[in-house]
UniProtKB/Swiss-Prot annotation:
Protein name: Glyceraldehyde-3-phosphate dehydrogenase
Keyword Lipoprotein: no
Biological pathway: Carbohydrate degradation; glycolysis; pyruvate from D-glyceraldehyde 3-phosphate: step 1/5
InterPro entries named among the record's database cross-references: DapB_N, GlycerAld/Erythrose_P_DH, GlycerAld_3-P_DH_AS, GlycerAld_3-P_DH_cat, GlycerAld_3-P_DH_NAD(P)-bd, Glyceraldehyde-3-P_DH_2_arc, NAD(P)-bd_dom_sf
Annotated catalysed reactions: D-glyceraldehyde 3-phosphate + phosphate + NADP(+) = (2R)-3-phospho-glyceroyl phosphate + NADPH + H(+); D-glyceraldehyde 3-phosphate + phosphate + NAD(+) = (2R)-3-phospho-glyceroyl phosphate + NADH + H(+)
Primary location class: cytoplasm
Active site: 141
Any one cellular-component term (Gene Ontology): cytoplasm
Binding positions for D-glyceraldehyde 3-phosphate per the UniProt entry: 140-142, 195-196
Subcellular localization(s) per the UniProt record: Cytoplasm
GO biological process, one term: lysine biosynthetic process via diaminopimelate
Organism: Sulfurisphaera tokodaii (strain DSM 16993 / JCM 10545 / NBRC 100140 / 7) (Sulfolobus tokodaii)
Domain of life: Archaea
Gene Ontology MF term list: 4-hydroxy-tetrahydrodipicolinate reductase; glyceraldehyde-3-phosphate dehydrogenase (NAD+) (phosphorylating) activity; glyceraldehyde-3-phosphate dehydrogenase (NADP+) (phosphorylating) activity; NAD binding; NADP binding
Length: 343
């Protein structure tokens, strides 16, 4: 099988995970990563044998730090079949003219505005619609979590209304300049938060309102959600559907004593997962409650890794490499993504 050549522009929290995931795919070759600062992440990438590309003016800085440079970011893009842009929020749009001028397909992340791409993407929701699109935006971690739940619930009964509150982590574990550390901050105080609008870029016309707050934690986001569906639903049907859906796992707090994001992370550590990543949505089974045609639930979203499999599937969708079910299966198998129960 001839492998497609993939470049990752940006090598931070998401970029390094996507790069590692690409290296595990049977149909992809990581040709290199774009990095503008010679920090510890660049040093580690170099030690792992990943080719590093940077902007021309920074080549000397990398070499001074003992980091080998394979060329400029433009050189990398020229060699690639597709670029996964994981640069900081808003930066991806500034690179789009480069990708366009070289005729390269590109993926962008949820921090970019929706109009940067031809389509916003969630593998469980609209993989087929994204096939053959030159520019795809993989929605944010929180939006990915919401969409997995909503699109899965649609299999049981059409979702007509969603009301959700997002308790956001304040910072990633490595981020030392973000907070708060002793406050809960409305994000924003006005309603709705931007997450509702982002869901609408994938599922058109749904009645959705979201609110968000930032909490002093680094581990995961936590969502509380109320869905109104067309027909009366049964709790057992919801549980069984979740158990049989890839990238959603349940945790039974009563049985396992796992009842917090901290304990979910600890389980992932004890399972030996790389970086303790949890790319699955983790639904607290005990929280699932039905009242007529209303469904209530809570679930955790690991912000550092949930979008990684989405990026892998988006590569295949953009280049037309595989159908939806095949791509999701290959991605899940290579990345060790679970379904069913966490424990």
């Amino acid at each position: 099988m001839e492998k497609v050549k993939v470049a990752v522009n940006g090598y931070g929290t998401i970029g390094k995970r996507v790069a590692d995931a690409i290296r595990l795919q049977p149909d992809m070759e990581l040709i290199g990563v774009g990095k503008t600062s010679p920090n510890y992440e660049a040093i580690i990438a170099d030690k792992k044998g990943i080719k590093i590309y940077t902007v021309k003016d920074n080549i000397g800085k990398f070499e001074k730090s003992g980091i080998r440079v394979a060329g400029t970011i433009e050189d990398m893009v020229k060699e690639a079949d597709i670029v996964v842009d994981t640069t900081p929020n808003g930066v991806g749009a500034t690179y789009k003219p480069l990708y366009q001028s070289l005729g390269k397909n590109a993926l962008f992340q949820g921090g970019e505005k929706a109009d940067v791409a031809d389509i916003s993407f969630s593998a469980l929701c609209n993989y087929d619609e994204a096939k053959g699109k030159k520019y795809i935006r993989v929605v944010s971690c929180n939006t990915t979590g919401m969409l997995r739940i909503i699109c899965t619930m649609n299999k049981i009964s059409k979702v007509e209304k969603v009301r959700a509150t997002i308790v956001r982590r304040a910072a990633d574990p490595k981020e030392v300049k973000r907070g708060p550390i002793n406050s809960i901050v409305p994000d924003p105080a006005s309603v709705p938060s931007h997450h509702a609008k982002d869901v609408l870029t994938v599922i058109k016309g749904i009645d959705i309102v979201t609110m968000a707050v930032i909490a002093p934690t680094t581990l995961m986001h936590l969502h509380t959600m109320v869905l109104t569906v067309k027909d009366k639903v049964n709790r057992d049907d919801i549980i069984n559907t979740f158990l049989n859906t890839p990238r959603i796992i349940l945790v039974n707090s009563s049985r396992t004593t796992v009842s917090s994001t901290a304990e979910i992370i600890e389980v992932s550590r004890d399972m030996g997962r790389v970086r303790y990543d949890i790319p699955e949505v983790v639904v607290f089974e005990d929280s699932i409650y039905t009242n007529g045609n209303e469904v209530f639930l809570m679930y955790g979203v690991h912000q550092e890794s949930i979008v990684v499999p989405e990026n892998i599937d988006a590569i295949r969708a953009s280049l037309g490499l595989m159908g939806k079910e095949e791509s999701i299966k290959v991605t899940n198998d290579t990345l060790g993504i679970m379904k069913g129960y966490l424990l």
